[in-house]
Amino acid sequence: MATRARLPVLVVLTITLAAAVSCGTCPPVPSITALSPSSATAGGSQFLLTVSGNDFRRDSMVSWNNSFRVTTFTSSRRLVATVTATDIAQPGTVLVFVFNLPEGGTTFVSGGIGLVSTTACRGKSSNAVSFTINP
C-alpha cells in the first residue's frame, strides 16, 4: 500500500491594481485662450497654427473644423498644428478646439474604506474658438 504524504499548500493571494487605476479626479479639461494667427486669407499657403491655453498634454490633438490635425506638443500651455492650404481654400469660419485623449480608459477611484466612488474618465474637449478665413 502506497503512503501519501501531505504537503502543505500555500495559497498566495495577489492583488494587483492596474496602472489605469489611480486616486484622485479625472484630468482637467483643456482650454484655449488664443490662436496665432487668428485668421488667414482664402487660397493661402499651408501654415503652423499656434494654440495657446491650459491643461494641454503630450497626447492632445488640435481639431480643425471637426478634423484632427498633425499636432506638436510644446508645453502644457502651447500646441502647434499644421493647417493645410486645402483647409483654407474657401472663405468662412472654422471652429478650433483641443481634445485630450482618454488615458487608456482610466478609472479614478476615491473614497475611504467602505466608501468608494469611481469615475470613468473619457476624452475631454476644450472650448471652441473661431478661426476666420477671409476672402
Please give the residue ranges for each predicted region.
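Generic detector of short alpha-helix boundary/capping microenvironments
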Residues: 10-15, 28, 39, 84
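Short strand-edge motifs at loop-to-beta-strand transitions and within beta-strands
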Residues: 77-81
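Short, surface-exposed loop/turn segments at beta-strand-coil junctions that are enriched for proline
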Residues: 82-90
